[in-house]
Structure formats: C-alpha cells, structure tokens
Regions:
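Short, charged low-complexity linear motifs
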Residues: 2, 46-48, 107-112
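Sec-dependent signal peptide recognition
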Residues: 2-8
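C-terminal motif of bacterial Sec signal peptides marking the signal peptidase cleavage site
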Residues: 12-15
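Bacterial lipoprotein signal-peptidase II cleavage site
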Residues: 17-24
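Membrane-proximal amphipathic alpha-helices
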Residues: 25-29
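Short solvent-exposed beta->alpha transition segments
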Residues: 30-31, 35, 40-94
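Exposed beta-sheet edge and beta->alpha loop/turn motif
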Residues: 84-135
C-alpha cells in the first residue's frame, strides 16, 4: 500500500504540466507571433522553437538568443518573464501568408519586429527576419 501511494504521488507530480508552456497550434499569424514572443520572454526556448520556421538560420538565431538570455541575471530573467507584450502594428505584407508584427515588451520597451509566415498551412515565425529585415 505504501509503495502504491508513492508511485501514485510520482505519477501525479510528473504528469502536471503548465498549460502556458505547452504548444498550441496557432489559429493565425498574431497567435503564432504572440506565443513565440511570450515563450522567449519566459526563457522557454524549446517551446518557442515550436512556433518557429525550422531551418538552420532560424535555429542559429534562437540558439544565440537562448545563450544570451541564459547569461542574464536571475533578476533580469524574472523581469522578462513578467513582461507583457505591447503590439504597436500588425502588417499583412502578403495577405494570408506573410505578416510582420511590430512590438516591444514592458521591461525593455525596445521596438522589435517578427515576421510570421504560413508554412504548410501552419503559422510560424521566421526568426531570422528579426535580424536581417529581409522579407
């Protein structure tokens, strides 16, 4: 009886997931961009990567961004995690396939942009655009 209680406790403990950290298929470009940004602010780069177009350039930039984030102080990480996303403009560059989201976060207030594309019917972030600016 004692062992079954312990096993049950472990099953319950390890089956609990934070629903905010899980991947949800985005319904539109804004959903994909917002989820990518939010997961990045929280330091959840594995989850953020699920909202990103999978290519070597994007993976390079996500890895670099992740390393930079991990070098920040715990205080800074907490501030990023609590930050809200302030979207200033959403531009449908190519309707139903390419959208650019201009945003900042409430911690740094630095204007940034992400490009979101529809790839194989799913909205994903083309992260390299953030650094190159090329459509």
């Amino acid at each position: 009886m004692k062992y079954s209680t312990i096993i049950l406790a472990f099953v319950v403990l390890f089956s609990c997931k934070n629903p905010e950290d899980e991947y949800h298929t985005p319904e539109n470009a804004l959903d994909a961009g917002r989820e990518f940004i939010q997961q990045s602010l929280k330091g959840n780069f594995n989850t953020a990567g699920k909202y990103m177009l999978q290519d070597k350039d994007n993976q390079y930039w996500l890895d670099r961004f992740s390393k930079e984030f991990s070098s920040k102080s715990e205080h800074e990480k907490a501030q990023f995690s609590k930050a809200s996303i302030n979207i200033s403009e959403v531009s449908d560059v190519v309707p139903d396939s390419v959208t650019v989201i201009n945003f900042s976060n409430s911690f740094t207030k630095v204007p940034q942009k992400v490009k979101v594309v529809k790839h194989n019917g799913v909205w994903v972030v083309d992260f390299k655009y953030t650094f190159s600016g090329n459509l």
